[in-house]
Amino acid sequence: MSTAFGERIRQIVSSEGARLRLVPENTASRKPAAETWCKKEVLGHLVDSAANNHQRFVRALLADELLFPAYVQNEWVRAQEYAGESWEGILDLWSALNRHLAHLVDRIPAAKLSMQCRIGENPPMTLEALIGDYIRHLVHHLAQIEAGGA
């Protein structure tokens, strides 16, 4: 089982979630530049990432090899209009999805971590690498939010 991954996700949700809750609604809505995402949209993108990876992680438990479609992040963010949603609502959804992902990855058998997964046209990667990549992606975008832009 991959409890180290789950623990890392829980730690991120706890520490970053507390910081994000201090961000005022108007600050979360402000775009740093016309072509960039506001904090709400960056966090919404992380909701989309959690939702896509939830499906990938569960399906990996049920199969021997997987091919997943890629997702077009800008279109997902635009379609869901995260900028018009409440900061608290997006934050609650992000927190809940990631707590569940932590619960899920805690239960992935070690033997499944070497399973090959393909996402779109990207080269295959193991489930373990996919989980690690998810965590790096999460940390990267949370740092963007903290720095004030996307």
Language-model features: locations:
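Short, contiguous alpha-helical
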Residues: E7, E25-E75, A102-H103, Q116-A150
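Acidic/histidine-rich alpha-helical segments that form the ligand environment
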Residues: R8-V13, G17-L22, V77-S114
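Terminal targeting/low-complexity segments that flank the catalytic cores of oxidoreductases
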Residues: M1-G6
